[in-house]
Swiss-Prot record:
Subunit (UniProt): Heterotetramer, composed of two GyrA and two GyrB chains. In the heterotetramer, GyrA contains the active site tyrosine that forms a transient covalent intermediate with DNA, while GyrB binds cofactors and catalyzes ATP hydrolysis.
Annotated gene: gyrB
E.C. code: 5.6.2.2
Recorded catalytic activity of this chain's protein: ATP-dependent breakage, passage and rejoining of double-stranded DNA
Keyword terms: ATP-binding, Cytoplasm, DNA-binding, Isomerase, Nucleotide-binding, Topoisomerase
Designated name of the protein: DNA gyrase subunit B
Coarse class of the protein's main subcellular location: cytoplasm
GO biological process, one term: DNA topological change
Family statement drawn from the similarity comment of this UniProt entry: Belongs to the type II topoisomerase GyrB family.
Subcellular location(s) per record: Cytoplasm
Tree of life domain: Bacteria
Alphabetized InterPro entries for the sequence: HATPase_C_sf, Topo_IIA
GO molecular function: ATP binding; DNA binding; DNA topoisomerase type II (double strand cut, ATP-hydrolyzing) activity
Length: 182
């Protein structure tokens, strides 16, 4: 072991790698179940924000037998257009970039219950798998992530006359070594 402490000792963790390296800084305890619950609250808070803004009438939270959790709402659906600065869909930006979302200006949400949280990108980073399905503008969009990394770009998989967002996630067993049941 070296006793050297100099500029080479300083490590910079960027993006979701920081979340995976130190998950407790973002969601709390990863052993006693509270971190798992925090992840659920993060996704539910986004749906509640749609309801508070007057765009959502129904939120369905399901705990599945495979220890995954899904949250479905009938809000506007996460934006699916290409984000000009990032070059990928706005949905992918929201799911993969810390501190990205529609609650930082005065136009998208007048009321928000979710700003105290860490964001859905943290849930994505700490999930073995996450499925995102968006009903918006007459289309059904879907993207699958593994450990926060998209398998592919957001794709149109069908047509719809509905709107809303569906998120289903499977918490990472590498992160949650203690309590992994909801």
């Amino acid at each position: 072991m070296s006793n050297t402490y100099d500029s080479s000792s300083i490590k910079v963790l960027k993006g979701l790698d920081a979340v995976r390296k130190r998950p407790g800084m973002y969601i709390g305890d990863t052993d006693d179940g509270t971190g798992l619950h925090h992840m659920v609250f993060e996704v539910v808070d986004n749906a509640i924000d749609e309801a508070l803004a007057g765009y959502c009438d129904e939120i369905i939270v399901t705990i599945h037998s495979d220890n995954s959790v899904s949250v479905r709402d009938d809000g506007r659906g996460i934006p699916t257009g290409i984000h000009e600065e990032e070059g990928v869909s706005a949905a992918e930006v929201i799911m993969t970039v810390l501190h990205a979302g529609g609650k930082f200006d005065d136009n998208s949400y007048k009321v928000s219950g979710g700003l105290h949280g860490v964001g859905v990108s943290v849930v994505n980073a700490l999930s073995e798998k996450l499925e995102l399905t968006i009903h918006r503008d007459g289309k059904i969009h879907q993207q699958i992530y593994r450990s926060g990394v998209p398998d592919d770009r957001l794709k149109v998989i069908g047509e719809t006359d509905k709107s809303g967002t569906f998120v289903r996630f499977w918490p990472s067993l590498d992160t949650f070594k203690g309590e992994t049941e909801f």
